[in-house]
Amino acid sequence: MSLRSKMKTTRRSIAIVGAGDASAAVCDLAYAAGRAVANRGAVLICGGRGGVMAAAARGTRSAGGMSVGILPGYNRDEANPHIEIAIATGMGEARNAIVVASADAVVALEGEGGTLSEIGLAIKLGRPVVGLRAWQQLEMISHADDPVAAVDLAWELARPRMIRSIAGDQGRAANDPGPMSRAPALAGRKKSAT
Protein backbone atom coordinates (compact mmCIF):
# COMPACT_ATOMS: atom_id res chain seq x y z
CA MET A 1 0.00 0.00 0.00
CA SER A 2 1.41 3.36 -0.97
CA LEU A 3 1.81 6.29 1.39
CA ARG A 4 -0.81 8.20 -0.59
CA SER A 5 -3.43 5.45 -0.17
CA LYS A 6 -2.68 5.23 3.55
CA MET A 7 -3.26 8.96 3.85
CA LYS A 8 -6.72 8.56 2.36
CA THR A 9 -7.73 5.94 4.93
CA THR A 10 -6.14 7.40 8.04
CA ARG A 11 -8.23 10.02 9.82
CA ARG A 12 -7.04 12.13 12.68
CA SER A 13 -8.82 11.69 15.96
CA ILE A 14 -9.25 14.41 18.55
CA ALA A 15 -10.35 13.71 22.11
CA ILE A 16 -12.50 16.23 23.91
CA VAL A 17 -12.33 15.76 27.67
CA GLY A 18 -13.97 17.54 30.57
CA ALA A 19 -16.48 17.32 33.38
CA GLY A 20 -19.22 14.71 33.29
CA ASP A 21 -21.42 17.21 35.12
CA ALA A 22 -20.71 20.53 33.39
CA SER A 23 -22.41 23.91 33.30
CA ALA A 24 -24.47 24.99 30.30
CA ALA A 25 -21.71 27.45 29.30
CA VAL A 26 -19.05 24.71 29.30
CA CYS A 27 -21.38 22.37 27.39
CA ASP A 28 -21.87 25.10 24.78
CA LEU A 29 -18.08 25.24 24.32
CA ALA A 30 -17.91 21.44 24.07
CA TYR A 31 -20.73 21.40 21.50
CA ALA A 32 -18.94 23.98 19.33
CA ALA A 33 -15.65 22.09 19.67
CA GLY A 34 -17.40 18.85 18.68
CA ARG A 35 -18.78 20.52 15.56
CA ALA A 36 -15.29 21.81 14.74
CA VAL A 37 -13.88 18.27 15.05
CA ALA A 38 -16.44 17.02 12.50
CA ASN A 39 -15.87 20.00 10.22
CA ARG A 40 -12.15 19.14 10.19
CA GLY A 41 -12.97 15.58 9.14
CA ALA A 42 -11.55 14.15 12.35
CA VAL A 43 -13.08 11.48 14.57
CA LEU A 44 -14.18 12.57 18.05
CA ILE A 45 -12.95 10.41 20.92
CA CYS A 46 -14.51 10.96 24.34
CA GLY A 47 -15.59 9.18 27.51
CA GLY A 48 -19.03 8.60 26.03
CA ARG A 49 -21.18 9.69 28.96
CA GLY A 50 -22.73 13.03 30.03
CA GLY A 51 -21.69 16.65 30.40
CA VAL A 52 -18.79 17.70 28.17
CA MET A 53 -18.74 14.27 26.54
CA ALA A 54 -22.41 14.36 25.52
CA ALA A 55 -22.22 17.97 24.34
CA ALA A 56 -19.13 17.30 22.21
CA ALA A 57 -20.70 14.17 20.70
CA ARG A 58 -23.92 16.09 19.98
CA GLY A 59 -21.89 18.78 18.20
CA THR A 60 -19.98 16.22 16.17
CA ARG A 61 -23.15 14.41 15.20
CA SER A 62 -24.91 17.66 14.22
CA ALA A 63 -22.11 18.35 11.74
CA GLY A 64 -22.20 14.83 10.28
CA GLY A 65 -19.09 13.59 12.06
CA MET A 66 -18.20 10.35 13.80
CA SER A 67 -17.90 9.99 17.57
CA VAL A 68 -16.41 7.15 19.60
CA GLY A 69 -17.26 6.81 23.28
CA ILE A 70 -14.86 4.89 25.52
CA LEU A 71 -17.14 3.83 28.38
CA PRO A 72 -16.10 3.01 31.95
CA GLY A 73 -18.59 0.14 32.38
CA TYR A 74 -19.46 -3.10 30.64
CA ASN A 75 -22.72 -1.87 29.13
CA ARG A 76 -22.75 -0.03 25.80
CA ASP A 77 -26.20 1.29 26.68
CA GLU A 78 -24.47 3.66 29.15
CA ALA A 79 -23.35 5.80 26.20
CA ASN A 80 -25.04 9.10 25.56
CA PRO A 81 -27.41 9.02 22.55
CA HIS A 82 -25.03 11.00 20.33
CA ILE A 83 -22.24 8.39 20.37
CA GLU A 84 -21.92 6.50 17.11
CA ILE A 85 -19.49 3.83 18.31
CA ALA A 86 -19.65 2.83 21.99
CA ILE A 87 -16.80 0.78 23.43
CA ALA A 88 -17.56 -0.79 26.81
CA THR A 89 -14.29 -1.32 28.67
CA GLY A 90 -15.27 -2.36 32.20
CA MET A 91 -12.19 -0.40 33.31
CA GLY A 92 -13.82 2.39 35.30
CA GLU A 93 -11.77 5.58 35.33
CA ALA A 94 -8.78 3.66 33.92
CA ARG A 95 -10.55 3.99 30.58
CA ASN A 96 -9.14 7.53 30.51
CA ALA A 97 -5.89 5.99 29.28
CA ILE A 98 -7.71 4.53 26.28
CA VAL A 99 -9.39 7.85 25.54
CA VAL A 100 -6.11 9.74 25.24
CA ALA A 101 -4.11 6.87 23.71
CA SER A 102 -6.71 6.64 20.93
CA ALA A 103 -6.43 10.34 20.10
CA ASP A 104 -3.88 12.26 18.08
CA ALA A 105 -4.54 15.38 20.19
CA VAL A 106 -6.66 16.36 23.18
CA VAL A 107 -8.87 19.40 23.79
CA ALA A 108 -9.47 19.79 27.54
CA LEU A 109 -12.32 21.78 29.04
CA GLU A 110 -12.86 22.36 32.74
CA GLY A 111 -13.19 19.27 34.85
CA GLU A 112 -11.85 17.61 37.95
CA GLY A 113 -9.54 14.72 38.74
CA GLY A 114 -10.60 12.56 35.80
CA THR A 115 -9.93 15.35 33.32
CA LEU A 116 -6.62 16.14 34.98
CA SER A 117 -5.62 12.46 34.73
CA GLU A 118 -6.42 12.54 31.01
CA ILE A 119 -4.26 15.64 30.56
CA GLY A 120 -1.39 14.00 32.46
CA LEU A 121 -1.65 10.77 30.48
CA ALA A 122 -1.77 12.70 27.21
CA ILE A 123 1.41 14.58 28.13
CA LYS A 124 3.09 11.31 29.14
CA LEU A 125 2.10 9.73 25.80
CA GLY A 126 3.29 12.74 23.82
CA ARG A 127 -0.17 13.80 22.70
CA PRO A 128 -0.62 17.55 22.28
CA VAL A 129 -3.15 19.07 24.69
CA VAL A 130 -5.07 22.32 24.18
CA GLY A 131 -6.88 23.78 27.17
CA LEU A 132 -10.14 25.44 26.09
CA ARG A 133 -10.76 28.28 28.57
CA ALA A 134 -9.42 25.97 31.25
CA TRP A 135 -6.22 24.70 32.81
CA GLN A 136 -4.34 27.98 32.26
CA GLN A 137 -2.11 27.14 35.22
CA LEU A 138 -0.65 24.20 33.27
CA GLU A 139 2.30 25.49 31.29
CA MET A 140 2.92 22.14 29.56
CA ILE A 141 -0.17 22.51 27.39
CA SER A 142 -1.36 24.98 24.77
CA HIS A 143 -4.36 27.24 25.38
CA ALA A 144 -7.24 28.69 23.37
CA ASP A 145 -10.30 30.78 24.21
CA ASP A 146 -12.41 29.82 21.19
CA PRO A 147 -13.66 26.26 20.47
CA VAL A 148 -12.84 26.38 16.75
CA ALA A 149 -9.38 27.82 17.48
CA ALA A 150 -8.79 25.05 20.05
CA VAL A 151 -9.66 22.31 17.55
CA ASP A 152 -7.65 24.02 14.79
CA LEU A 153 -4.63 24.17 17.10
CA ALA A 154 -5.09 20.53 18.15
CA TRP A 155 -5.35 19.58 14.46
CA GLU A 156 -2.10 21.37 13.62
CA LEU A 157 -0.25 20.04 16.66
CA ALA A 158 -1.33 16.49 15.76
CA ARG A 159 -0.02 16.83 12.20
CA PRO A 160 3.63 15.86 12.85
CA ARG A 161 2.48 12.82 14.83
CA MET A 162 0.17 11.77 12.00
CA ILE A 163 2.93 12.11 9.41
CA ARG A 164 5.18 9.82 11.47
CA SER A 165 2.31 7.37 11.97
CA ILE A 166 1.39 7.23 8.28
CA ALA A 167 5.02 6.77 7.32
CA GLY A 168 5.26 3.83 9.72
CA ASP A 169 7.74 5.42 12.08
CA GLN A 170 5.53 4.60 15.08
CA GLY A 171 6.16 7.80 16.96
CA ARG A 172 9.87 8.35 16.31
CA ALA A 173 11.05 11.90 15.90
CA ALA A 174 11.16 13.05 12.28
CA ASN A 175 14.97 13.26 12.35
CA ASP A 176 15.42 9.80 13.94
CA PRO A 177 16.34 7.32 11.18
CA GLY A 178 15.29 4.39 13.38
CA PRO A 179 16.93 1.50 15.22
CA MET A 180 18.53 -0.08 12.16
CA SER A 181 20.75 2.97 11.63
CA ARG A 182 22.11 2.51 15.16
CA ALA A 183 22.71 -1.24 14.78
CA PRO A 184 26.48 -0.97 14.04
CA ALA A 185 27.01 1.08 17.20
CA LEU A 186 24.99 -1.36 19.28
CA ALA A 187 26.72 -4.44 17.85
CA GLY A 188 29.97 -3.66 19.66
CA ARG A 189 28.35 -3.42 23.10
CA LYS A 190 28.55 -6.32 25.52
CA LYS A 191 25.41 -7.53 27.19
CA SER A 192 25.42 -7.28 30.96
CA ALA A 193 25.08 -10.50 32.88
CA THR A 194 21.95 -10.10 34.94
Where are these predicted regions, by residue range?
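C-terminal binding/interaction regions
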Residues: E93-L157
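A charged, well-structured terminal subsegment
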Residues: A101-V106, P147-G171, D176, K190-T194
